[in-house]
Amino acid sequence: MNQLQNLAEALSASSPVSGTVQTVVDGNTTTTTTTNTGLGVVAVGAGLAMIGAIGSGLGQGYAAGKTVEAVGRNPEMISKIRATFIIGAGIAETASIYSFIVALLLIFVGK
């Protein structure tokens, strides 16, 4: 039970903070509630967005290894192999670029 209480306290520390503002205009009272998502929640989201770069990195490493093997087997075809590898690496890199853009948007816009 103590672990659940610790987890609940940790989650409440990173939960959005809300505040209430009361405005009086011409005798009328208006209550407005504001919510501020903490920077901690945004940072966790940005970190999770960068998980998309893991698959891209693994795929590019595997492709580079296979490219070296192909050049080792047939050195005369290096120009065609290189061109194919560069195109494939560019396509594989798009996932990590999109993940990075999402992380930047969360950090700078998601406050």
Curated annotation (Swiss-Prot):
The chain crosses the membrane at residues 38-58, 89-109. Its main location: membrane. The keyword Ion transport applies. It is a multi-pass membrane protein. InterPro entries: ATP_synth_csu_bac/chlpt, ATP_synth_F0_csu, ATP_synth_F0_csu_DDCD_BS, ATPase_proteolipid_c-like_dom, F/V-ATP_Csub_sf. GO terms for cellular component: plasma membrane; proton-transporting ATP synthase complex; proton-transporting two-sector ATPase complex, proton-transporting domain. GO terms for molecular function: lipid binding; proton-transporting ATP synthase activity, rotational mechanism. Signal peptide: none annotated. Keywords: ATP synthesis, Cell membrane, CF(0), Hydrogen ion transport, Ion transport, Lipid-binding, Membrane, Transmembrane, Transmembrane helix, Transport. The keyword Acetylation does not apply. Belongs to the ATPase C chain family. PANTHER family: ATP SYNTHASE LIPID-BINDING PROTEIN, MITOCHONDRIAL, ATPASE PROTEIN 9. HAMAP family: ATP_synth_c_bact. This is ATP synthase subunit c. The gene is atpE.
